[in-house]
């Protein structure tokens, strides 16, 4: 029975991830005044399936001087972690209702750094190594602000359980009282998922494709799938944290529809940002975090910690 639950969670995520690749190509196409994929199937709808078949039947080549174990382990770890991050997500019921769901998500997203580091180092290529080092520095840096923002939200929520956020936001979405944090959170999720304008790891002009430059076929597809699964997961988390999904006991099915719609809109914003902005320079990326976001989030976190003490109230303060 539990295996069935896991399959019911994983299969829709994989389908959503597959069609997100198509949506991205379509949206970028229309923004650049062209059609995008429109040959495979009606309106190009079967393109992701064709891509998957093509990638998984190709021979997975490996550089002669690479570390065999780490080279194959890294993409598997990346994809496993990307799927595991969904375990505590309330949609409306999580797979496992964890007391410390927020800490679980933070811990697993930190572990994802290892897969990037291993893939860059095991490839034995200078492009892959530089790309991996950049990705690790970027991910670790932005996780600091993500953790502080999450702490502020948990102060408003009163617990580390994600499921209670729905109750907290019954009367008002947390995006209204926490809008500076929400903006910084959204930008940090862009950096955390290595998306434009923060895709320094795969600067085509200098690093070819970044840490996955030596990968081909199946292992490359796993990295690709992990990236897009993480994008949907981050947007689902943003929806849960700031745009508390509609909760009505009379129409429980509306919760999921509402949740999916908000996640989709946020994902479209990711794609819109990608189509609109040029890439940041590496030093600008680090300055933005350490000199702008970190002091601001720390100040706001102190403010949210002091609120219960001042008002002598118990969270949620809504």
Swiss-Prot record:
Protein location: Mitochondrion inner membrane
A single cellular component GO annotation: mitochondrial inner membrane
Gene Ontology molecular function terms on file: NADH dehydrogenase (ubiquinone) activity
GO biological process: mitochondrial electron transport, NADH to ubiquinone; mitochondrial respiratory chain complex I assembly
InterPro entries noted in UniProt: NADH_UbQ_OxRdtase_su1/FPO (IPR001694), NADH_UbQ_OxRdtase_su1_CS (IPR018086)
Subunit structure and binding partners: Core subunit of respiratory chain NADH dehydrogenase (Complex I) which is composed of 45 different subunits.
Gene transcribed to yield this protein: MT-ND1
Leading EC class: translocase
EC number: 7.1.1.2
Transmembrane segments: 2-22, 37-57, 69-89, 100-120, 136-156, 171-191, 231-251, 253-273, 293-313
Protein name, entry field: NADH-ubiquinone oxidoreductase chain 1
Membrane topology: Multi-pass membrane protein
Catalysis: reaction(s): a ubiquinone + NADH + 5 H(+)(in) = a ubiquinol + NAD(+) + 4 H(+)(out)
Main location: mitochondrion
Family: Belongs to the complex I subunit 1 family.
Alphabetically ordered keywords of this record: Electron transport, Membrane, Mitochondrion, Mitochondrion inner membrane, NAD, Respiratory chain, Translocase, Transmembrane, Transmembrane helix, Transport, Ubiquinone
Function: Core subunit of the mitochondrial membrane respiratory chain NADH dehydrogenase (Complex I) which catalyzes electron transfer from NADH through the respiratory chain, using ubiquinone as an electron acceptor. Essential for the catalytic activity and assembly of complex I.
